Amino acid sequence: MSFPCKFVASFLLIFNVSSKGAVSKEITNALETWGALGQDINLDIPSFQMSDDIDDIKWEKTSDKKKIAQFRKEKETFKEKDTYKLFKNGTLKIKHLKTDDQDIYKVSIYDTKGKNVLEKIFDLKIQERVSKPKISWTCINTTLTCEVMNGTDPELNLYQDGKHLKLSQRVITHKWTTSLSAKFKCTAGNKVSKESSVEPVSCPEKGLDIYLIIGICGGGSLLMVFVALLVFYITKRKKQRSRRNDEELETRAHRVATEERGRKPHQIPASTPQNPATSQHPPPPPGHRSQAPSHRPPPPGHRVQHQPQKRPPAPSGTQVHQQKGPPLPRPRVQPKPPHGAAENSLSPSSN
């Protein structure tokens, strides 16, 4: 490597080291200032009193070496944009802080002779404000929880009746084993904000949690609604089935009645004699009187046997008198002897 190249490299290295040392020194001597995201902040110059000898006050960002505001006598105050506002006492106001406003700010003050009478550096850091912590507990699990939802680098602290219990970042969980009745306080904070919540907690040794009671009531209500719907559904199905069966029975009865009406026979006249055997008996011989039937039974061996006759079917719609039991036997008719023969038979006896 040639001598000119070595000289340039050495110069750049020395300049880089000196620049880093100056920046580190500025950060070390900087005043740490905290701002809340979305809020305004005033960068006040400590131990400074405005006088007529002051001619120039200049503010700049050290990250880009850019002038953001300047005050000079008998001249209009300079500001880079509406975000900044410079007061006559040298205070710089930054409106509606954003994350990119986090930087190192430097103020330089000169008198009318051009002499630097004061120089201050501010290390501005921005955080999001913490939200109010939320305290919740359950008596069944004997557990209390404190948590914070929003905020940059929050710090939680839990107290019971003024006694510090735990420290955490986002969530604190506390358990107990006996009955409890105490006042809990949970605080959340960071560099720019602080919030707290207080809750009186009362848990008997054998108590029911309000959420358990609500769950039981809700489950019971749902069960009752389900049972009512089930009963309604079953009843409706039974009614539909009964109505369908009634319609089927009515249709079947109508069909049977129609078929019977089509098969009905014609009426038969009821002029048939009840005992045809009497009509077949031969008439008595001439000259003989028929004797009235006596009530004596005929001698044995001479009983007339009548064969049963088939009765004609009774016509529909008419009532036919039917004789109960077998037909009664008729007495045998004997012919009366002639009158002359009777006299001849009586004469010898008289002689």
Swiss-Prot record:
GO-annotated molecular function: identical protein binding; receptor tyrosine kinase binding; signaling receptor activity; signaling receptor binding
Every Ig-like C2-type domain range: 129-209
One Pfam family it belongs to: C2-set
One cellular component term from this protein's GO annotations in UniProt: cell-cell junction
Subcellular location field: Cell membrane
Effect of residue 67 to R: Loss of CD58 binding
Start and end residues of each stretch annotated as Disordered: 237-351
Name this polypeptide is given: T-cell surface antigen CD2
Source organism (scientific name): Homo sapiens
